């Protein structure tokens, strides 16, 4: 095929998508995940200093859970990042409603309303994890070309840490995370970082990822064609809990030193998972090789999760470009 | 010339305690103490009783550092002598109870040795914390532990600073020893950190058993880091931090910090340098619990402490 014909072929294969209206950058959805808290504060300071023109597209900054941020806790009453399903968003608010349910509905009004035509195009929800996950982009759908292209872009541009894409594959109304309020929203998860700590290296990665996301949206809206191709993603399959005492439910083992910090490695049958306090190794019994992630996340002990397991998938995304009146 | 005349004869250490959960989200000590409360076989030694104990059970239950106030700052003379039990913050009540069970602080009936188990988000490795440069028993014990742990490094932090020293839970004992192992996030149990702490305690109890059995320990020296100064984060007029520990300093506990070295990085990318006249050795770099105590790190200086030979005093 000649170069001209190939170019024409690509142009014809492009998917035309509407321009994106802007992005909401949300930090402090969990009040002790500090990169996002400080990044949002820094962005608000920049806006005060230099005006809205500091970014080439409209940017809204949100401190999602201000009470939890003030107390440097994950949440006050309940995990806010589980409050955005259609069911919880439509729960009537009473005096005894958990703070986060109330606040989730406020955010839904501000950034949504989820499911309507009026929603924000993009939410970037900023999170940290105690797990060694580098930069992980989390999205609830496996077929959103805009989000997948942004992920692809971040993967090419960010080289300091591994950049991986995790898809949860929920129908949107069941998706319970903050970013599901928007059309193309995703979570920016950076680790490892302890709760209540801001590490400069982690902050810098998160800032770079937000800047590149804004950059992509601006380029896309300005007519850049983003070439299609393959995107490797990890799809959530199941969770695994710690070994526990049947009566007290106390832990009887810790994540094995050979698994600790090896997020997204390939885990095969027989590989060590846990080292018990009495010195025994608990090994993997899964039939098929899977990839563990969120290994030893501090907030997941109370959820009964030592790590999640994922399958690797290759998705193919088409070339995309912005819809203009000519190409509509 | 033998050093026979320079042997210090000390009282045997019959009553030993291991405290976990002084901070309810520092998991290694909590798991170890609970494990040994269930089954004390591992910590049994001839010639001594060793009591494992959870010092702040309500904080442990909520997996939080403290309920009302930091227990590890609560053992002040004012607190310990306070009355009106019901009106006191939870941790002050607890301090009084612990002082009654394991003290009284400064009294002849107090426990001989208390090991207080802590974790830190700082990259301090295995650290033993001492409150006195003249406690021969403790100096000989940490010397023994360091030798036994080698080639794994055990650093020794000495906090004898009149203003920066604080009233710790372990201070009710005659010989208080802090164990600080990191890095480990709050609320997380890392296997390697857990096992290091467990091994340190094994060697510590071995030492006490040998000592109580009449073994003489020859004179020794101990390399320590002596606490000098607390360094806070740069803050704005509202008290909010405006910079983070610089990537060049992050995780470099115990390494020299020289004049002109990067110290902080502002959120908008500017580097702030260390301007002190002398080389210092920072530690507790970026400990999560110290943001509210206005501490980004502490500076230390290196010192060599000498300890006489010791052996158990004959009755």
From Swiss-Prot, chain A:
- EC number(s) given by UniProt: 3.5.1.114
Q: Which residues bind Zn(2+)?
A: 30, 33, 127
Coiled-coil portions:
none
The annotation note on the cofactor reads:
Binds 1 zinc ion per subunit.
Question: What cofactor is needed?
Answer: Zn(2+)
Which keywords does the record carry? Cell membrane, Cytoplasm, Hydrolase, Membrane, Metal-binding, Zinc
Q: Which domain of life is it from?
A: Eukaryota
A single GO molecular function term of this UniProt record: hydrolase activity, acting on ester bonds
Its Gene Ontology cellular component terms are: apical plasma membrane; cytosol
> Any keyword Zinc?
yes
Q: Report how it sits in the membrane.
A: Peripheral membrane protein
- Binding positions for substrate? 74, 81-82, 189, 300
Q: What is its subcellular localisation?
A: Apical cell membrane; Cytoplasm
HAMAP family in the record: Aspartoacylase
Protein function: Plays an important role in deacetylating mercapturic acids in kidney proximal tubules.
Instruction: Describe, as the record does, how this protein assembles with itself and its partners.
Output: Homotetramer.
Q: Family membership, please give it.
A: Belongs to the AspA/AstE family. Aspartoacylase subfamily.
- What protein name applies here? N-acyl-aromatic-L-amino acid amidohydrolase (carboxylate-forming) A
Species: Danio rerio (Zebrafish)
Q: Which gene encodes it?
A: acy3.1
Swiss-Prot record, chain B:
- List, alphabetically, the SUPFAM superfamilies matched: Zn-dependent exopeptidases
List of residues binding Zn(2+) = 23, 26, 118
- Provide the Gene Ontology terms for cellular component: cytosol; nucleus
- UniProt KW keywords: Cytoplasm, Hydrolase, Metal-binding, Nucleus, Zinc
What catalytic activity is recorded?
Answer: an N-acyl-L-aspartate + H2O = a carboxylate + L-aspartate
The cofactors it requires, by name, are: Zn(2+)
Quick one: where is this thing mainly located? Answer: cytoplasm
Q: Where is the active site?
A: 180
Cellular compartment(s): Cytoplasm; Nucleus
GO MF annotations for this entry? aspartoacylase activity; hydrolase activity, acting on carbon-nitrogen (but not peptide) bonds, in linear amides; hydrolase activity, acting on ester bonds; metal ion binding
According to the record, how does the cofactor bind? Binds 1 zinc ion per subunit.
Signal peptide positions on this chain: none
Which NCBIfam families does the protein's record reference? PRK02259.1 (NF002601)
Instruction: State the PANTHER family in the record.
Output: ASPARTOACYLASE (PTHR15162:SF9)
Family per UniProt?
Belongs to the AspA/AstE family. Aspartoacylase subfamily.
Q: Write the protein's name.
A: Aspartoacylase
Tell me what organism the protein belongs to.
Answer: Danio rerio (Zebrafish)
Source organism phylogeny: Eukaryota, Metazoa, Chordata, Craniata, Vertebrata
In the UniProt record, the gene name given for this protein reads aspa
